[in-house]
Regions:
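Short loop/turn segments that flank or connect secondary-structure elements
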Residues: 1-36, 42-45, 49-260
Length: 260
């Protein structure tokens, strides 16, 4: 989910859709373009994507990032993007694509769930709220839009897990927008605070070790029930991490914890 600037809204590629506006699309084995969209991708991974994928593959978050992700700080950016690493061959195929389809379909990333749409978020600073932007943007080779099934952006999410992906990706987008301005000062985006922030949102297993095996709980008073949940539940720990990063970098307080 990308941040959308008010000034360049009309320049965004694709067809902008209202939440209840219709589009036609279908995808299935046997369609002539099947799996072509799984090649040569800049496929962004969001924090919840990493949680689902590392659990699906039975590895730690750090191991998943090392094996399957590229961490890229773009020029002028203040927080790195995490992208799924494609296979190192001419086709650049997704490592989880098979002739039958996606090998990790139940845990596929949010971007894949939204395809052929792209979602953006526009932040209204005066009102303190965000607005969803929907863009219908299938690639030129895609035959999906020529099929008969009709959808709306609001009805496109059909998998039972889509709501969890949607909610956590939006929460991440609302945090990520704060990084439009430099929070690092002299430390820069490779300094200690930057490494801590990245750990809290992307390397969830290392963050759990930090919370429970350092002086963290001596320095912060955390709700007792939440502490128990965070020991085992990745999602509770991730949402705590979002709030902790806001406090660490911008002093935004949370009801979940306070300094002792």
């Amino acid at each position: 989910m990308k941040y959308v600037d008010f000034d360049n809204l009309d320049e965004l590629p694709g067809r902008r859709l209202a939440e209840t506006e219709t589009f036609t699309f279908d995808c299935f084995p046997g369609i002539s373009c099947f799996n072509r969209c799984c090649r040569n991708l800049n496929l962004f991974l969001y924090p919840y994507d990493v949680i689902r994928l590392k659990n699906r593959l039975a590895m730690s978050s750090g191991e998943f990032i090392d094996r399957h992700a590229s961490v890229v700080l773009r020029p002028g950016g203040f927080f790195p993007d995490v992208l799924l690493r494609m296979q190192d061959d001419r086709e650049g195929l997704c490592p989880f694509a098979t002739p039958e389809g996606c090998a990790i379909y139940g845990d596929r990333p949010d971007t894949c769930r939204k395809f052929p749409m792209e979602e953006g978020v526009r932040y209204h600073p005066g009102a303190g709220k965000t607005e969803r932007i929907y863009l219908f943007r299938p690639p030129d080779f895609c035959q999906g839009p020529r099929q008969a099934r009709t959808w709306t952006p609001a009805g496109w999410a059909q998998d039972p897990d889509d709501a969890a992906y949607d909610r956590l990706t939006l929460e991440w987008a609302e945090l990520k927008v704060l990084f439009l301005n430099d929070p690092w000062g002299r430390e820069g985006p490779a300094g200690p605070k930057a490494k801590m922030a990245f750990m809290a949102v992307y390397n969830i297993d290392r963050f759990r070790d930090f919370v429970f095996n350092s002086s963290f709980l001596k320095r912060y008073k955390v709700q007792a029930l939440l502490v128990k949940k965070m020991e085992k539940e990745d999602v509770d720990l991730l949402r705590f991490g979002f709030d902790w990063v806001k406090f660490l970098l911008w002093g935004i307080r949370s009801e979940k914890f306070r300094p002792r």
